[in-house]
Structure formats: C-alpha cells, structure tokens
UniProtKB/Swiss-Prot annotation:
Signal peptide span: none
Biological process annotations from GO: activation of innate immune response; alternative mRNA splicing, via spliceosome; cellular response to exogenous dsRNA; defense response to virus; innate immune response; neuron projection development; positive regulation of defense response to virus by host; positive regulation of type I interferon production
Record organism: Pongo pygmaeus (Bornean orangutan)
Annotated domain remarks: The WW domain may play a role as a transcriptional activator directly or via association with the transcription machinery. The WW domain mediates interaction with WBP11, ATN1, SF3B1 and the C-terminal domain of the RNA polymerase II large subunit.
Protein name: Polyglutamine-binding protein 1
Subcellular location: Nucleus; Nucleus speckle; Cytoplasmic granule
Length: 265
C-alpha cells in the first residue's frame, strides 16, 4: 500500500525515505452540461421534413417545431393540416416595437412641420394682439371704476345689515339672560302662588278624595297653646264631628252604671 504524498515528503526531508513515488494522475473527463432544447430522437421518430426539429420550451414546458432555415415555428407538426407556421413571439414583439418607433418618428416629423406653420401664422397675429391689449386695458379701467362703486355700495349694505343683526342679537341675548335668571332662581317671587296651585295633589291627602280643605305643610302638627283634649282637629265635614274621645275610666264607669240600671229594673 503506497504512503500518502504528504507523509512521503516529510520522511524524505528527514532522510528516512529516499525514493518518492510519483502522484497518480487523475483522468479528467470533460462533459457537456449545456442543455440542448432540440429533441433529436423525437425528430427522427416523427420523420419531420428537412430543417425541421422538435424543440422543448422550458418556459411553458411544452414542445414546439422549429425550422432552422426560415426560423419559423409551429405548435403542431408540419405534417398536421391544422398547423400554423408563424414567427416566434419574441420576433413578433421586436418587429412590432420597430414599427411603433418608425410611426412615432413620422408623427414627430409631422408635428415639427405643424409647429413651423403655426409660428408663421403667429407673426401677423402679434399686431392684432397689441391692439386687443389696448382695448382690454381701457375695458379694465372702466370695469375697475364700476367695481369700486359696486364695492362701496356693497359695504354700505353690509354695514346696515350688520347693525340690524347686532340689534336683534342684543334683544335676543337680553331675553335669554332673563329666562336663565328665572330658571336659576330657587323660589321666584312672582310665581310662588302659581307654582303652589300647579303642584299635583297627593293621592293620600283627604282633600284629593273628599270635601276636606287642602292642608299646608304645618297642618296636623301640634300647636304650642292648644289643649290636649284628644279631639281630632283635622276631621271636618258632615261625616266627621269634632268631639273628644272618652278615657278608659269613663268607659268603665259608664258600663257599671248601665249594669246597675239593668239590675234595678
């Protein structure tokens, strides 16, 4: 088994190994890695006419037929009656672009000719423009005078209108302030009696379901110098008579006296 080349050189430097074995030469095989789109086998099997080849299109993944002499292509075989032989899409696009460029150049030339004719027509029109400018200037001066008068009249009208608006705004502001004061006041003096009349009746108040007069906030409260007779001072009307309630002792005495009279009888 031969030693590695690196080890042989190290041993040769030290004087241990005197004979160096030559490195084996590797055989380099050159291969063509270029993708040839022409399918020669399919061309031979289909029996295509001379100069026609079957080519694979890598962009769409489909084969087409190409004539090497005329550089025309077809999706179907030349033997097929439905085949349409035309130029490739790339060549058609380039030819269309060239035609558009030529058309644009012709349009540019015609536009330049029109510009030259327009310039020649513009020269005699300059004299007319000067006279028109003079007329325009006089018209402008006249219009400025009219505009000045109209502006002054409009200012006077706006001033009068603003005065009328200011007066109406002042009156409206006074009315708003007056209403606001009346709303903010807790007990307005002028509306005390009206507010009392407008208050709704309490359904538990006797005056809401009988002829009893409507009471005030102090009705039913005890008075300082009022004798405690036990009479219902709030009762009024034909069905309610003001009389004191009898005490329990008076009731017992009245019952005893009534029983005595029954026994005597």
């Amino acid at each position: 088994m031969p030693l590695p080349v690196a080890l042989q050189t190290r041993l040769a430097k030290r004087g241990i190994l005197k004979h160096l074995e030559p490195e084996p030469e590797e055989e380099i095989i050159a291969e063509d890695y270029d993708d040839d789109p022409v399918d020669y086998e399919a061309t031979r099997l289909e029996g295509l006419p001379p100069s026609w080849y079957k080519v694979f299109d890598p962009s769409c993944g489909l084969p087409y037929y190409w004539n090497a002499d005329t550089d025309l292509v077809s999706w179907l075989s030349p033997h097929d009656p439905n085949s349409v032989v035309t130029k490739s899409a790339k060549k058609l696009r380039s030819s269309n672009a060239d035609a558009e460029e030529k058309l644009d150049r012709s349009h540019d030339k015609s536009d330049r000719g029109h510009d030259k004719s327009d310039r020649s027509h513009e020269k005699p029109d300059r004299g007319h423009d000067k006279s028109d400018r003079g007329h325009d200037k006089s018209d402008r001066d006249r219009e400025r005078g009219y505009d000045k008068v109209d502006r002054e009249r409009e200012r006077d009208r706006e001033r009068d209108r603003d005065r009328g608006y200011d007066k109406a705004d002042r009156e409206e502001g006074k009315e708003r302030r007056h209403h606001r004061r009346e709303e903010l006041a807790p007990y307005p003096k002028s509306k005390k009696a009206v507010s009392r009349k407008d208050e709704e009746l309490d359904p538990m108040d006797p005056s809401s379901y009988s002829d009893a007069p409507r009471g005030t906030w102090s009705t039913g409260l005890p008075k300082r110098n009022e004798a405690k007779t036990g009479a219902d001072t709030t009762a009024a009307g034909p069905l309610f008579q003001q009389r004191p309630y009898p005490s329990p002792g008076a009731v017992l005495r009245a019952n005893a006296e009534a029983s005595r009279t029954k026994q005597q009888d």
